[in-house]
Structure formats: structure tokens, C-alpha cells
């Protein structure tokens, strides 16, 4: 099972990725992890990527695609893989297709922007313990205080409304076109299969729909 999981930040991709990888016995592959592993292993591609990153540059799509091909040739990908956060752009998707990397399924976890803003901007964290609360869905016993220590809770920079809205706008301009790309490819060639899963409701409900789509 070779899967791409798409969805905005806060859509719940991480949770669904965990269930998919467990069910099918496939690794979750993110470009960040892949780059770090290649750099650590000191492979030729890893060293090339390291020199680019050390100079403050962005790793080229060509290099990323070659890293992907190297990674999915490893034994743990024999039964497939799940791409998380890749491809991000149309050129990456086209390069992946042109490199002959076959995909079985593209799954989009779709959640309305306002719901995502509510989900993320309501998060509060107790820095010392890592305990996470939500002002609406999982509030602390005393507003703004950690249940155990009574210490102040904080809102992470990433969870501030303006940051969330900026990340969503980047997602819509850059990654949303991928949804159209794969829908079109699926309609024209029959592969990969494309599924749109509404990411609202209980985790169990969303997981059941996601796994049913992949069966």
C-alpha cells in the first residue's frame, strides 16, 4: 500500500498516519526525517543535502526525489509506504510521477479552516511537563493553570491565531493544488485512487472512514 496523506496543519494527519502505518505494516516517510537520516548516514545524497542546508539553501526537488527513491528501495518499504508532507508542490508531484514512483492511494483529510483555527488556537501547554489542554475541548480545572502543578499554561507561537492562518494560507496556495492534480490523474488513469475524508467527528469515526477507503 503506497499512500500519500494530504491535509492542512491541524487536520489530524498525524493521528491517521499512525493507524494507517500500523494496519498495513508500512513506514511513515517524511522528508525531514529522510533528510536527517541521509545526512547522518553520510550517503552521497545526504552529503549533498547537508552542504546545501549548511549554506542556508533549500534542498532542490531533484535531490529530494532521489532521496525518496533511495529511501523507498529499502527493505522496510517492501509492502509500501506512507508519505507525510510530501509532495508539497505540483513540480514535486510531477517529478515523483516522472521518476516512475507508483502510488496506490491519495487520501485527503479535509477540515474547514475555521475549525482548524479553533482546534489549534485553543491549545494550551504546560511547558515543564508537556501536558496539553484545550480551552474548549479539554479545559484545565482552573482556567490558564496546569491541573497538577497549578503553574501557568502557555500558548505556543505555532498555535497563535495569526500563525495558524498564515500556515493555512501557505497550505492553500501550495499544497491544495495537489488535490486537484491527483484528482485529475486519478480520473484520467485510474491510479492513484483518490479519497476525500471529512476530518470532523470522533477520531474512531475518521479512522474507520480512512481505513475503509484504503481497503
Swiss-Prot record:
Where do the coiled-coil regions begin and end?
A: none
- Indicate yes or no for the key word Transferase: yes
Any idea of its EC number? 2.7.4.3
Q: In which pathway does it act?
A: Purine metabolism; AMP biosynthesis via salvage pathway; AMP from ADP: step 1/1
- InterPro entries xrefs: Adenyl_kin_sub (IPR006259), Adenylat/UMP-CMP_kin (IPR000850), Adenylat_kinase_CS (IPR033690), Adenylate_kinase_lid-dom (IPR007862), P-loop_NTPase (IPR027417)
**Where does the record place it?**
Cytoplasm
Which reaction is recorded as catalysed by this protein? Answer: AMP + ATP = 2 ADP
Q: Name one GO biological process term.
A: AMP salvage
Residue ranges of region NMP? 30-59
The role this protein plays is: Catalyzes the reversible transfer of the terminal phosphate group between ATP and AMP. Plays an important role in cellular energy homeostasis and in adenine nucleotide metabolism.
Q: What is this protein called?
A: Adenylate kinase
Q: Which organism is it from?
A: Ectopseudomonas mendocina (strain ymp)
Which gene name belongs to this protein? adk
Amino acid at each position: 500500500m503506497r499512500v500519500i496523506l494530504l491535509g492542512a496543519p491541524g487536520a489530524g494527519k498525524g493521528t491517521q498516519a499512525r493507524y494507517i502505518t500500523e494496519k498495513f505494516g508500512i513506514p511513515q516517510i517524511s522528508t525531514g526525517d529522510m533528510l536527517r537520516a541521509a545526512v547522518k548516514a553520510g550517503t552521497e545524497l545526504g552529503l549533498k543535502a547537508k552542504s546545501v542546508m549548511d549554506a542556508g539553501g533549500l534542498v532542490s526537488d531533484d535531490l529530494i526525489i532521489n532521496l525518496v527513491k533511495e529511501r523507498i528501495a529499502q527493505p522496510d518499504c517492501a509492502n509500501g509506504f506512507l508519505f507525510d508532507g510530501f509532495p508539497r508542490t505540483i513540480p514535486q508531484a510531477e517529478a515523483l510521477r516522472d521518476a516512475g514512483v507508483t502510488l496506490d492511494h491519495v487520501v485527503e483529510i479535509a477540515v474547514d479552516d475555521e475549525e482548524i483555527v479553533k482546534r489549534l488556537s485553543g491549545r494550551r501547554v504546560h511547558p515543564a511537563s508537556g501536558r496539553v489542554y484545550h480551552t474548549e475541548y479539554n479545559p484545565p480545572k482552573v482556567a490558564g493553570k496546569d491541573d497538577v502543578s497549578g503553574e501557568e499554561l502557555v500558548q505556543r507561537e505555532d498555535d497563535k491565531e495569526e500563525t495558524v492562518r498564515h500556515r493555512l494560507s501557505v497550505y492553500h496556495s501550495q499544497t491544495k493544488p495537489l488535490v486537484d492534480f491527483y484528482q485529475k490523474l486519478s480520473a484520467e488513469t485510474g491510479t492513484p485512487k483518490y479519497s476525500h475524508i471529512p476530518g470532523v467527528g470522533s477520531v474512531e469515526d475518521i479512522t474507520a472512514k480512512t481505513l475503509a477507503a484504503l481497503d
